[in-house]
């Protein structure tokens, strides 16, 4: 999947979050396969999502960013933390604790069918163009 397509799907997901007022911490992963290897989730992402679910987040917004910022620092309470997998048919919100348990049980990937069973939410999207789902 091209970076342009990844950026587009991230924009679509972020718009959904704004419209539906869905709150949490989200790490988006895109795949054109019927599964997502856990190796695509970096250690810092596993650690970060578990920490935000348990302790929340305090984050200093960068002064280097040229865009206007609403404030200097964010302090957010613990909220659900998800790995969001963009499969061909939609976004699957998988709680980080479920991903961690699967890894501890020896799993190396999550299939779309397994994601459908354990997802806290599934946001279906329409397939518009085949090129949206092709590998680079």
Residue ranges of model-derived segments:
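Charged phosphate-binding loop/patch that engages nucleotide di/tri-phosphates or the phosphate backbone
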Residues: 106-136
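Mg2+/Mn2+-dependent nuclease catalytic core
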Residues: 31-55
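Conserved catalytic cores of phosphodiester-cleaving nucleases, focusing on short active-site segments
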Residues: 19, 23-33
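Surface-exposed flexible segments
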Residues: 35, 40, 93-107
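Acidic-basic catalytic patches of nuclease active cores, encompassing PD-(D/E)XK
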Residues: 1-22, 134-136
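Short connector loops at helix/strand junctions that flank enzyme active sites
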Residues: 23-25, 44, 76-78
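Nucleic-acid nuclease catalytic cores
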Residues: 50-101
């Amino acid at each position: 999947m091209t970076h342009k397509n990844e950026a587009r799907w991230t924009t679509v997901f972020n718009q959904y979050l704004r419209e539906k007022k869905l709150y949490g911490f989200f790490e988006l992963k895109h795949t054109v396969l019927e599964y997502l290897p856990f190796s695509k989730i970096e250690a810092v992402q596993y650690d970060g999502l578990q920490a935000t679910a348990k302790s929340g987040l305090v984050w200093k917004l960068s002064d280097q960013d040229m865009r206007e910022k609403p404030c200097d620092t964010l302090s957010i309470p613990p909220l659900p933390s998800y790995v969001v997998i963009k499969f061909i048919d939609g976004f699957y919100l998988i709680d980080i604790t479920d991903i961690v348990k699967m890894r501890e049980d020896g799993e190396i990937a999550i299939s779309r069918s397994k994601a459908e069973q354990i997802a806290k939410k599934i946001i279906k999207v329409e397939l518009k163009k085949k090129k949206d789902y092709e590998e680079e």
